[in-house]
């Protein structure tokens, strides 16, 4: 693996964990010395992958692991069709920017084999992917295997996406975040979407979903997968709809199955399938304030009503499982009836679908297919935990993957914040992955800056949840920042920040000179009113006396201060302070 040169801060460097032939990426942050001595470098999780030319794609990290197991083979694959790139490509006669990098023949399981991480885990096999994840999460590989075997965690790694660096989604591991990218019929290009992918993973996206609905759907996805170090998810019904000229009623199993296989062969790692939208549940949405807000959910609801039968996704679910088991594609069982407003939260339609999704989860597990369950949406704070509890009950602890939820509907332009509040809350209660929301939610297609804002905001929510859950090592990052802050190590504060660029920019707006990077104050309070500087001065002036007096620690109820010796000592210091002019900073 080639180290990335373009780090987000000069104190950052690529510093992998190397063990048993594996090279697991981490970022090392070099810290300055404290007054009391040197600080060890701080290490953080890294998602960005190696530096590469987007026209060539990433190294095929997992290729040898996959083929060494001896249970897959290459085959010719389906014929590439122009309609795969949508109606605009049909009119032009070609895709706008064909992928010309490496594209080996696709792999799939040999007859009678299932090549999923769940199948291996249930057979007692610890794969290289599991070993990689264990090093990345700083846990035992057997623990990883057991969680995957039970369905409580997934490692989404299609055999046709060998460029991906294994990661795990489960509530006993670090909370992960997903970033959505993808073009629309109105805007964006292949180059822009690849740039968004690289930008999202640079700032910490653990997975990326390509939700393209516009031009060059197939080709855009090819560029994204070949350049992605993280798992790629899709909602295949979007592309299938494009193949039938956008008419939901004209969709059928044959078109959808062909689209699924197309995406499996390309290397999509997980797919959102709205198989829980049943005909009987649609009338339950009629009294809602915002109806059905999921694009996939509305497409399938329209199809069910047009044909007055259960969807082909539900009727052919077992065949979907068989296909996914041949490529190790994970289900992301979509919540097509999720609430789109607080008024509709936790209603009969939402929970009826969730219960069906739980049943589908068990069916997928019969085929050793990995599953995560999608969740809301828009939910008031006081109603969030019920979603965790019912998902864990009905879906047997399969990883929960939620969009927020947004906890208020009054802040267009700030929905990254309204949703991050709910995201931190629901992740604290057990949700394994959070789908980011950008400031453009409900308003427009996010650009590169919006992607960064969404990722940073959701990294905050995920980390806050990990701290609250007591995840091993989570608070160490906060403690390192707090120590740097108290010691006025400004450059270390910037380096330890989720977004060093913004931290530096805000600091330098008022104190741009280089000496300000070592000053014992900031522009908020100035030099005379900085609480941390005053606290440091108190330690410097009275530290020995405080230690001698046996000042109690936090929660120490023995109250050594109450002793007569302590009272006399404090009185003496009080007289000295007043006699000296009663100034904290003596001139």
From Swiss-Prot:
Annotated [4Fe-4S] cluster binding sites: 522, 525, 530
Reaction equations catalysed: 5-amino-1-(5-phospho-beta-D-ribosyl)imidazole + S-adenosyl-L-methionine = 4-amino-2-methyl-5-(phosphooxymethyl)pyrimidine + CO + 5'-deoxyadenosine + formate + L-methionine + 3 H(+)
List, alphabetically, the Pfam families matched.
Answer: ThiC-associated, ThiC_Rad_SAM
Q: Which cofactor does it need?
A: [4Fe-4S] cluster
The cofactor note reads: Binds 1 [4Fe-4S] cluster per subunit. The cluster is coordinated with 3 cysteines and an exchangeable S-adenosyl-L-methionine.
Establish whether keyword Nuclease is in the entry.
no
Q: What is its EC number?
A: 4.1.99.17
Which stretches of sequence are listed as region Disordered? 1-58
| Annotated positions binding Zn(2+) | 378, 442
MF terms from GO for this chain are: 4 iron, 4 sulfur cluster binding; carbon-carbon lyase activity; zinc ion binding
* GO CC, any one term: cytosol
Q: Where is the composition biased (Basic and acidic residues)?
A: 17-33
Enzyme class, UniProt record, top EC level: lyase
Q: Which UniProt keywords apply?
A: 4Fe-4S, Iron, Iron-sulfur, Lyase, Metal-binding, S-adenosyl-L-methionine, Thiamine biosynthesis, Zinc
GO biological process, alphabetically ordered: thiamine biosynthetic process; thiamine diphosphate biosynthetic process
Residue positions binding substrate? 180, 209, 238, 274, 294-296, 335-338, 374, 401
Please name the pathway. Cofactor biosynthesis; thiamine diphosphate biosynthesis
InterPro entries, sorted: ThiC, ThiC-associated_dom, ThiC/Bza_core_dom, ThiC/BzaA/B
NCBIfam families, per this entry? PRK09284.1, PRK13352.1, thiC
Q: Which purpose does this protein serve, as stated in its record? A: Catalyzes the synthesis of the hydroxymethylpyrimidine phosphate (HMP-P) moiety of thiamine from aminoimidazole ribotide (AIR) in a radical S-adenosyl-L-methionine (SAM)-dependent reaction.
The entry's family comment says:
Belongs to the ThiC family.
What is the protein's name according to its record?
Phosphomethylpyrimidine synthase
Q: Which organism is it from?
A: Corynebacterium glutamicum (strain ATCC 13032 / DSM 20300 / JCM 1318 / BCRC 11384 / CCUG 27702 / LMG 3730 / NBRC 12168 / NCIMB 10025 / NRRL B-2784 / 534)
């Amino acid at each position: 693996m080639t180290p990335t040169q373009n780090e987000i801060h000069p104190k950052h460097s690529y510093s992998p964990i190397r063990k048993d032939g594996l090279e697991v990426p981490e970022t090392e942050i070099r810290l300055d010395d404290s007054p009391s001595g040197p600080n060890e470098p701080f290490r953080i999780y890294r998602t960005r992958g190696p530096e590469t030319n987007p026209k060539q794609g990433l190294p095929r990290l997992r290729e040898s692991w996959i083929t060494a197991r001896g249970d897959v083979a290459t085959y010719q694959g389906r014929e590439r069709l122009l309609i795969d790139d949508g109606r605009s490509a049909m009119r032009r006669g070609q895709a706008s920017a064909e992928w010309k990098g490496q594209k080996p023949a696709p792999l799939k399981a040999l007859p009678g084999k299932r090549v999923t991480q769940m199948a291996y885990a249930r057979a007692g096999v610890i794969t290289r992917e599991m070993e990689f994840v264990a090093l990345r999460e700083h846990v035992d590989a057997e623990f990883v295997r057991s969680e995957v075997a039970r369905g409580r965690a997934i490692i989404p790694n299609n055999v046709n996406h060998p460029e991906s660096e294994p990661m795990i989604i489960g509530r006993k591991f670090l909370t992960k975040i997903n970033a959505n990218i993808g073009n629309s019929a109105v805007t964006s290009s292949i180059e822009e979407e690849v740039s968004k992918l690289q930008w999202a993973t640079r700032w910490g996206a653990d997975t990326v979903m390509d939700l393209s609905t516009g031009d060059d759907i197939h080709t855009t996805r090819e560029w994204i997968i070949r350049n992605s170090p993280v798992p790629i998810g899709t909602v295949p019904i979007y592309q299938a709809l494009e193949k039938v000229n956008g008419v939901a009623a004209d969709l059928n199993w044959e078109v959808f199955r062909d689209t699924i296989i197309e995406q499996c062969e390309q290397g999509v790692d997980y797919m959102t399938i709205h198989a829980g939208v049943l005909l009987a549940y649609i009338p339950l949405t009629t009294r809602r304030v915002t109806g059905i807000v999921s694009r996939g959910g509305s497409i399938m609801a329209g199809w069910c009503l047009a044909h007055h039968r259960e969807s082909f996704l539900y009727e052919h679910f077992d065949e979907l499982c068989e296909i996914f088991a041949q490529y190790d594609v994970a289900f992301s069982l979509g919540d097509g009836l999720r609430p789109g407003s607080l008024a509709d939260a936790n209603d009969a339609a939402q929970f009826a679908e969730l219960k069906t999704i739980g049943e589908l989860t068990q069916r997928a597990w019969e085929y050793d297919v990995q599953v995560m369950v999608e969740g809301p949406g828009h939910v008031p704070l006081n109603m969030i935990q019920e979603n965790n509890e019912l998902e864990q009950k009905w879906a047997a602890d399969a990883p929960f993957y939620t969009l927020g939820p947004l906890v208020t509907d009054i802040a267009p332009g700030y929905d990254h914040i309204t949703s991050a509040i709910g995201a931190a809350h629901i992740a604290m209660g057990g949700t394994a992955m959070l789908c980011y929301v950008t400031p453009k939610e409900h308003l427009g297609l996010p650009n590169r800056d919006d992607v960064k804002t969404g990722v940073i905001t959701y990294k905050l929510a995920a980390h806050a949840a990990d701290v609250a859950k007591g995840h091993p090592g989570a608070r160490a990052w906060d403690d390192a920042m707090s120590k740097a802050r108290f010691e006025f190590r400004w450059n270390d504060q910037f380096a330890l920040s989720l977004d060093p660029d913004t931290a530096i920019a805000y600091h330098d707006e008022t104190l741009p000179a280089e000496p300000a990077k070592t000053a014992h104050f900031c522009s908020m309070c100035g030099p005379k009113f900085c609480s941390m500087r005053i606290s440091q001065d108190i330690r410097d002036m009275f530290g020995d006396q405080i230690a001698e007096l046996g000042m109690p620690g936090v929660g120490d109820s023995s109250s050594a201060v109450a002793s007569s010796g302590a009272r006399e000592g404090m009185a003496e210091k009080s007289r000295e302070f007043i006699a000296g002019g009663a100034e904290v900073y003596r001139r």
